[in-house]
A protein has these predicted regions:
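Conserved aromatic-histidine-acidic binding/catalytic patches
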Residues: 7, 153, 157, 215-216
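N-terminal glycine-rich phosphate/pyrophosphate-binding loop and immediately adjacent elements
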Residues: 1-129
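Generic alpha-helical structural context detector
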Residues: 67, 183, 201-204
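Active-site-adjacent bridging/hinge elements
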Residues: 29-32, 197-203
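Helical element adjacent to the flavin cofactor pocket in flavoenzyme catalytic cores
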Residues: 202-216
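A short glycine/serine-rich beta->alpha loop
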Residues: 44-48, 188-190, 211-214
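Rossmann-like flavin
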Residues: 91-197
């Protein structure tokens, strides 16, 4: 069977490889000179630039592609877990190191507003519920049937998907700095924390589940 995949971002490459593993003859079409989509690397005036995202939040999805061809990922790529994920620096000079170290996170939160430590814990628990529904159950399900989408409405309402990410975070967190820190995740996918649906808050828990990695 012949198949054509348009776009060589992570999704396009993954689709092409999965089809190839099923013995399809695959043509991968890309308008840029290099593969990778937003994850491509390009050079200009002697400098090397990342075309988009620079970190990996669910490395097992990449490992799966190598396993389809009985290849060992470590023979081709090096993926390093990061200790500090993001460093936030505010206009007043205050900095916050965001990481998967819960003790460090809570200590930093306590220094800003001790009452928000409990709110942070509750926020993480709530984003786990969003993750369970939005990622674990639905990430690989095609949304091509209106009735199926209608059945999701009660669950989405229960998860407060009508709120923005910032609004959801604000319902748990009172300090403005912490609100901005904990609602930044839509920026990673080109969204606005003040308008993007709170379903994207699942990224907060996704990072805690698998960590953040950098590919060398």
């Amino acid at each position: 069977m012949n198949s054509v995949v348009i776009g060589s971002g992570f999704g396009g490459i993954a689709a092409a490889l999965r089809l190839k593993a099923k013995n399809h003859n695959v043509i991968l079409i890309e308008k840029q000179q290099d593969l990778g989509g937003r994850a491509r690397v390009f050079k200009k005036n002697g400098f090397t630039f990342d075309g988009g995202p620079t970190v990996i939040t669910a490395p097992y999805l990449i490992y799966e592609l190598f396993e389809l061809f009985n290849k060992k990922p470590e023979n081709y790529i090096k993926v390093h877990p990061l200790n500090i994920w993001y460093r936030f620096i505010f206009e007043d000079g205050y900095s916050f190191d965001y990481s998967g170290d819960e003790n460090s996170m809570k200590n930093q939160i306590e220094k800003i507003n001790k009452d928000d430590v409990k709110g942070y814990e509750n926020l993480v628990k709530f984003t786990e519920k969003i993750f369970d529904k939005g990622f674990s159950e639905l990430s690989d399900v095609p949304f091509n049937k209106p009735f199926f989408m209608m059945k999701l409405i009660p669950s989405l309402i229960g998860l407060k998907s009508y709120k923005s990410v910032y609004s959801l975070v604000s319902s748990f967190i009172k300090n403005e700095k912490l609100r901005r820190i904990l609602s930044m995740h839509p920026l990673l996918v080109g969204g606005n924390p003040f308008t993007t649906t709170s379903i994207y808050a699942l990224i907060l828990f996704l990072e805690k589940k698998w960590g953040i990695h950098y590919s060398m």
